[in-house]
């Protein structure tokens, strides 16, 4: 069994400021490395800037500077942004380090010695106007696979690896003129010759079992289509020189040298670097990448290592993610679309909030849309109303009624039997790099803690049963300590602050989870987070939209709804949730209006007003689970605020029935989202506030006793059970 975790995040290009989409990988690796260290595993987290290649050379031309000066500038920018986000690298280096050239050239010489390098005369694009051969990224054109605009090495849209000559209507990126083909010599890595060894390695059950499904599928498809020789040299000035006669004016292709940067960056800092990089039996190499980098990490880099015929530490565990997009657009460095690292710093929103939201929506299986409204709602409900609320209410109650000193507690076995089995599940999710799921399981424990507090009503029992109440609160305090440990990989500054409340030195070890000792006193407490306000979010959304995006958004808003499929409108505009009716009051100003107090899973009552007199008695509805439009703009009815609208079915005879979600049949959970059946396992954004007309245009109907949109069933997100309309089998939903 491997005893050490070597963790890497894809080396970011140092030609621009990183945006939130770029940060997914370094943050993911950071959370895993923190978990690994808390678990007592010897861990090294390595990253750095990828500084050679076409992207840097072209950016330097644009900024009228040298490539090295450009790299120096952006390296410092990257470092400062990662520091603000509390990314705890063990090593953060550069591929322009003193060891990089030697290691890259040694890999090449070893590959050449072993017969895996071929020299080919080839035709390459040449720009007559600029009098230069054009490296792959100096050529742009239409992708032959998906017809999107692409550069000459890879299509960002469909991830297909390309050669510049594959592009349709190619153009020089500098002058935009059409280049000509001209003969030149280049060196190629003979991937077909390494294929047998590569496939043997991939088929080893200890290898690919730890890869994401999308990474394995993409790699197998690439192998199935047949490996081709891959050029490893380029006609550039900025890069690692090729140590071969006749190639003095060429450099290595950036994706030949960049993965080797993981090794050279380590060697540049650590003397015993070989104990990490030449120790495949003991070291578990865990790599975090985006889906556009999959083939370079599962094909190219392993082939370089295998072809060298040395005992390099090779990929064991791969965590690849999909794209994080911005408000229905892609983050784009070149177009300036989306939130960049320096923007996040100036928003006034703490780094732990940004971290939380990115982990909560980590695009593990499908692309995710960053939405400002969703940021506010997820943070306010899950991070603050759930997690932060538990910490505040328990510690405040202890100090107010029982003082700062924590007495030796009586362990409540019933309490901990609900909690401790969940710890192993969470740690296993961390181990498998399923970070989003791990975070959501932690939040479920926090929600359970709130429920235990609420159900036991300590504010009522503190006088009649003071000892039992003390024990309850003390057990909850140790639960909070455990939550601070589990949340440490995600929100480290907040976790440290919680442990500062207890006055102890930091105790971030998974070994103490579930233990009930070590906390003597509460030194102080304070609110962990302030809620995000709607006005602030609106201003930030406007500030970071840009004129072009604002116009596009306005055009999109003004498109006739008739052209939009109802299921798409529902997916993008409507948020339905299950709620439980806890209390019913009559509006004193209008007796036909019921005021419903609802449990929506946030431990904070939600209120809606509905005209149900004559249709139902209070007794018929109390305790029932119903469905509400949760993103309806608030309104007042006879002076009473309503924060949503329940949904009901109506048939052609005007019979009207509220949609009841049956406990015994459908197993609903308060706060659970209602989704389309074909949206299972998708990361869905939280839609903005809407008016009633927008909801009605989603055209939900009851059809043969089931709620549907355009023939697609509505289901409970967790249990996947269909939403039923037993009393009105066929009709409209309003």
UniProtKB/Swiss-Prot annotation:
Compartments, as annotated in UniProt: Cytoplasm
Any one GO biological process: methionyl-tRNA aminoacylation
Gene3D superfamilies registered for this protein in UniProt: HUPs (3.40.50.620), Isoleucyl-tRNA Synthetase, Domain 1 (1.10.730.10), Methionyl-tRNA synthetase, Zn-domain (2.20.28.20), Nucleic acid-binding proteins (2.40.50.140)
tRNA-binding domain residues: 570-675
GO CC annotation terms, alphabetical: aminoacyl-tRNA synthetase multienzyme complex; cytosol
Reactions performed catalytically: tRNA(Met) + L-methionine + ATP = L-methionyl-tRNA(Met) + AMP + diphosphate
Record's keyword terms, sorted: Aminoacyl-tRNA synthetase, ATP-binding, Cytoplasm, Ligase, Metal-binding, Nucleotide-binding, Protein biosynthesis, RNA-binding, tRNA-binding, Zinc
GO molecular function, one term: ATP binding
EC number: 6.1.1.10
Binding sites annotated in the UniProt record for Zn(2+): 143, 146, 155, 158
Co-factor(s): Zn(2+)
Keyword Zinc: yes
Pfam families, per database record: Anticodon_3 (PF19303), tRNA-synt_1g (PF09334), tRNA_bind (PF01588)
EC primary class: ligase
Highest taxon listed in the record's lineage: Bacteria
Locus of motif 'KMSKS' region: 330-334
Function of the protein: Is required not only for elongation of protein synthesis but also for the initiation of all mRNA translation through initiator tRNA(fMet) aminoacylation.
Subunit structure and binding partners: Homodimer.
HAMAP family linked to this entry: Met_tRNA_synth_type1 (MF_00098)
Protein family membership: Belongs to the class-I aminoacyl-tRNA synthetase family. MetG type 1 subfamily.
Name recorded for this polypeptide: Methionine--tRNA ligase
